[in-house]
């Protein structure tokens, strides 16, 4: 579960390393895996596509909080991570690092296809 002012890792090669959650789309108070959030780039790599302080949209792909599956099992990750996306939902980077939780059907298929492992 992601709340406002949370510092998140970036799981793609867009150039951002850490981002700050500054808002949610859809009038929500918190975000889970698959939700789109508004972030501000805080730590960026030199010569990346992302500029420090700029505002971007991102989709949550990993959370530290446990996620309950339909079969009763739970899954949790070691970090909260996002992938930066544009207005159409396509990722800004060309690679996605680490495992990605299965995202809602029909949404962010490009992000899931770039992921190394989909859980």
From Swiss-Prot:
Keywords: Ribonucleoprotein, Ribosomal protein, RNA-binding, rRNA-binding. GO terms for cellular component: cytosolic large ribosomal subunit. CDD domains: Ribosomal_uL14. One of its GO terms (biological process) is translation. One of its GO terms (molecular function) is structural constituent of ribosome. Pfam families: Ribosomal_L14. Part of the 50S ribosomal subunit. Forms a cluster with proteins L3 and L19. In the 70S ribosome, L14 and L19 interact and together make contacts with the 16S rRNA in bridges B5 and B8. Belongs to the universal ribosomal protein uL14 family. Binds to 23S rRNA. Forms part of two intersubunit bridges in the 70S ribosome. PANTHER family: 50S/60S RIBOSOMAL PROTEIN L14/L23, LARGE RIBOSOMAL SUBUNIT PROTEIN UL14M. This is Large ribosomal subunit protein uL14. It comes from Anaplasma marginale (strain Florida). The gene is rplN.
């Amino acid at each position: 579960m992601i709340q406002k002012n949370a510092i998140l890792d970036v799981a793609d090669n867009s150039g951002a390393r850490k981002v700050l959650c500054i808002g949610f789309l859809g009038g929500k108070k918190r975000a889970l895996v698959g939700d789109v959030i508004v972030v501000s780039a805080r730590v960026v790599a030199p010569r990346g596509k992302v500029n420090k302080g700029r505002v971007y949209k991102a989709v949550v792909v990993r959370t530290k909080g446990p996620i309950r599956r339909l079969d009763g099992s739970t899954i949790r990750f070691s970090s909260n991570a996002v992938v930066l996306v544009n207005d159409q939902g396509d990722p800004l980077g060309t690679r996605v690092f680490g495992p990605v939780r299965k995202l809602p059907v029909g949404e962010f298929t490009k992000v899931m296809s770039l992921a190394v492992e989909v859980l």
